[in-house]
Every structure is written in C-alpha cells, then in structure tokens.
Amino acid sequence: MSRPERSRSPVSLGAGIGAGLAAAGLAAVGAVTVDRLWRDRRHAIALGTEDDFTVAPSEVAVVVADDGVPLHVEIDEPEGWDGSRPTVILSHGFTLDLRCWVFQRRALLEAGHRVVTWDLRGHGTSGEGAEESYNIEQLGVDLARVIQQVAPTGDLVLAGHSMGGMTVMALAEADPGLFRDRVVAVALISTSAGGLHRITWGVGSMLGRVVNKFGPTALTQLSPHQDLLDSVLRGGKELQEFFVARGSFGSPVPLSLVRLTADMIFGTPLTVISAFTHTLEDHDKREALANMGGQEVLVFNGDKDVLTSAVHSTEIVDAIPGAEHVFVRDAGHIIMLEHPELLNQELFDLLTRADRSRGQTPREAGSRHTVTDLTKRRRDRMTRPARGRTRARA
C-alpha cells in the first residue's frame, strides 16, 4: 500500500532547501574552503563573543520624510552640551542600520560630542517607502529633513559609510549652501561617487560582471518570497555567517560582529534591497564633490574592500582639494566595526582640523597614507587556531 503524499508548508520546504543549499554550498566550495570555514569560525570564537552592541540614546525621535515615511533617529547628547561643538551625523550604508556605528557613537559621546544616527528608509526600524522612493537623491532629501528636525542650528560634521556616503553627496548636490554655511567637515567611508558597475564582489572581474548584470533581476524575482528566503537562510546559518565574514571583513573579527552584520544585512527586506540595487547602478555624484571643497574631508577605506575598492576612494580624493586619504591594510567594507579604533582616531583628527581651520582658506592639498592596525594584527595572531576541521560551536 503506497503512502499518501504529504504537502509541505513553505516553512518546512524552506528549511529543507536551506539545509540542501548549505550542503550544496559546502560541496561546491570544496574541502579547502570547508576547512577554512571551521578554522575561521574557531578563530572568531577565540576573539570573543561579547555581544553588547547597544547604546542607550539620550533621545529617540521619529522624523517624517517629505513623502510620509517615518525615519528612526537616535540622539546621543553629552551632559552639559552647550552647542559650541558641531553635531556629528552618521549615515549608515546599504543593508545596514544605525547599530553599525556603535563604537563611533560611544567614542564620540565620551569625547563630548553630540551624535545623531538614523536608519535610512527601508532599513532598521525606519518605515518603508514606495519602490520609486528608493534612490540616492531621496536619501539626500531624507538627510536634509533629519537635519532640519534634530540639528536645525549650529555646525555640522557629516559622516557616511557606503550608501550613507552617497547620501551625503546627494545632499551636497541638492543644497550646496548648507555645506558652505554649516558643514565644517565630511567623512566619506568605504563609499563611491559613481561607477559602481565596476564592482567585482571579490570574485574577479568576469564573474563580477555576471553578478552585476543578473543580480538585480534575481533579487526582483526573489523579493515576493521573503518568508521562504528567511527559512532558507536559517537552514544554512553557519554558511551564511562564513560568507558574510568573507564579504564584509578583511581580517578576523569576533563571531559576535559577524552575527551583528549578518543580522543587519538579512534583516533588510528583499524589496528594499532589490529597489536600491537598481538605483545604485546609476549613482553618479562626481560633480557634487566640488561642493565639499570648503570643508575638511576624510576619505577612509580598506585594501580588501570588495564593494568600494581603492579605485573609488582615489577618485573622490582626486576631486576634492585638501582631502585626507587614509587607506587601511587588512580592512574590508564594514570597516567601522572591523577597525573601530583607527576610524575613531581619524574622526577625532578630522574634528580637530575642522576646529583649527575656521576662517582660514581651504587647503589645496591633503595627505595620503596607508596604515596598519598593529594592535589588532597582534591580537589576531595570538588567537589564530591550528589547522584542522574540528567543528567549533558558539
């Protein structure tokens, strides 16, 4: 007697697909990569599993964008702040949220600076907008609205990572007067002014072109199936973390940072990812860089960034007279979590330069230097596990 055929729910089907994808993925990448997966995992655990990445803000605000989308904003204000120092506004990147700035928020607040962080539309706890609103120009409008609501007066320092840097460029294009009158410094971190079709995603130029050509279409087709994808991702959690670590960082980081990054990336709705992926291809704010010529500018990026490589940062520096270019060895795209101490120090130096340059003619030439995080490199070497395939758990 034959058994009755059972129908499978999308969740159970997704879990099965997830397990299958994990197995297939491991088989595809081969024994060497499997060994690396578990070795990297042991190393990540050895580096620590501390997972307190929260900051208790002084104030939480909801800024309503011009099209009605609620934008989540957090304000960190030091005790006794009198407005004499500039407000630092941090804009995060694509598929991240304001949690990525945890180390910079802590350091800047401790140093006595007022800090504003916000979730871009469709990211974190901000609301979602219409599909056509997911473009860089709209993000610039959103940033302007945040400034109007929570930092309407006083000097500003605008820092942006990846798509957050593009957001700052969009604002510079739309409102050069704001930059001339109030913005005293800009930090452009692991970002690009255009030419994102050149991204190789760390898989070489040929495969990179394939991903760039077919990736947006694939995301569009997947976007109605968010629940199924979530089930698939849960089924291959360790493989997911492995590829997040490989694509986001250029050196070993604690497993807790990998998980934080994965949580932000995979917590972003597919519809949002798909819409922004299409608009990123058309991003070009090279001409807007000229509007930053009167400010102190920091350009900060890593040598192992597979998304916004040195080509992009060099192009930005060449377009902004006096910009400081800091190129970090052993650093990937999520550089503010990977090398927080280095970035924090560069932000402090940027603020110092901005204060010293008040009323002076903008510099005609900045400096370019490559740095190595020696403290982190020593820590990584001390905790590096021996070769082997003993599976690590955490």
Which residue ranges define each predicted feature?
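Catalytic active-site module of serine/aspartate enzymes centered on a nucleophile-bearing elbow/loop
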Residues: 4, 318-394
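Hydrophobic alpha-helical topogenic segments used for membrane insertion/localization
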Residues: 8-39
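N-terminal cap/lid segment of alpha/beta-hydrolase-fold proteins
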Residues: 47-77
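Conserved HGGG/HGGXW glycine-rich cap/lid loop of the alpha/beta-hydrolase fold
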Residues: 69, 74-127
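Active-site loop/oxyanion-hole signature of alpha/beta-hydrolase fold enzymes
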Residues: 123-179, 345
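Flexible "cap/lid" loop of the alpha/beta hydrolase fold
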Residues: 173, 177-228
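Conserved alpha/beta-hydrolase catalytic His-Asp/Glu region
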Residues: 222-291
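Short beta-strand/loop motif that positions the catalytic acidic residue
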Residues: 292-293, 299-301, 305
